């Protein structure tokens, strides 16, 4: 595997460099200014070598003279032998075709022979040998091999390399294999992980983030049941990472039903809370009913924080899970926090559209006022969410809540002007001039409010038969009534209004759509049927009893 050939050489070089850096830092003191000393001069050095060494300015001072003549200086006399070993034996800097230069030409390198040479070399400097001792906390190159041919790992293990050596992040090779697991190469990774586990690699060893290999296996998208069961036999199933997540948290988040079942059957704590107060049950319920049933049917009693769990479901817009938990009597959506916030207010706050519609249909009371003076409507404006604003206004909020919402909106220096105008536009048709204009913070919108009232007054003064245009636009919900009046020229002319013209246009569009449905269905029924004998007026009267959805359905069927 070409990647392995490049990786083993690259990290053996880095290993040497990190040992040198460690030795230099130990031998120098901060209050002594040291000078660079010439170590060696090399000729015909490949530019790749120069670029590589330049990445380590704290170790090497490099001067180039002429073409490919390299003078290398260092501050550390005590470790000169180690540095020379690195330059001559590891980099092969004096020979044509150094290891670095040939990394891309993997066919010309006998990696197996190089590994044997490295581990069997009897003439290694003592400093170099220290890097290969078991258990030493260095940047051990074994712990950096991310993808490999497993025979080379076996060679290294058989020569006594410490299998759980860690890098500066506290990661072992087992950590690294799981971190960089690729589904496309899962067979190679699975084999290597099994080799490491069978050779006693510690599944509970934590890196600097508190991740054990077993936690990583649960956290990442690895669905290998065999690896999971091997780790499960030796792992601490309730170990936690830096954020307090356990393996059960992660497999629940990933919706891995079989892994959750195995951990629960092994006695994993289902009530462990992470630093955010979330239990594994909370992580699992957002995915659907199957995991909920598994937790509810377990022998352990679940700790349920009603407000927390409902808000968790709202954040993820998990309507199906909420509905099932309500059906089972596990939760209650009719709560009020100490700030007078309700479940509907939370749905608006987190922009959970589907959850909001569900809660409004189940419990329509959304006219709550929080202790800070916010309402659901003012929160929708603060979130710049026009869709949720339209849903709330369609539920016909009261004049009181609209005035309070407008006051709350205008308290903020930055607010969505268009959404505020939607509120004013809705409120203007419910109130009189004095009630609305007295809101001091609305003075900058006075011209818009006056425009709203002017258009409303015009519509109130215009009658079509026994109804005003205002009644038809704002008070009439029956579509058939609107069909009788909406085609009148006096109604159509109000489509040109600046503020409420769009509302009139929407009504006319709905009328035309319904007329088209009725006409198409009537024609379909005419073919080969006694229906054709009825007068058109009778046909229309009959079909008017169906709503638009029913008319559309019949058209599809016929």
UniProtKB/Swiss-Prot annotation:
Protein keywords: ANK repeat, Repeat
Pfam families according to UniProt: Ank_2, PRANC
Function: Contributes to viral release without involving rearrangement of host actin.
UniProt entry tagged with the keyword Cell wall biogenesis/degradation: no
Source superkingdom: Viruses
Name listed for the protein in its UniProt record: Ankyrin repeat protein OPG189
InterPro entries the UniProt entry points to: Ankyrin_rpt, Ankyrin_rpt-contain_sf, PRANC_domain
SUPFAM superfamilies xref list: Ankyrin repeat
Record family assignment: Belongs to the orthopoxvirus OPG189 protein family.
ANK repeat positions: 65-95, 169-205, 209-239, 243-272, 276-304, 339-368, 372-401
Gene: OPG189
Signal peptide coordinates: none
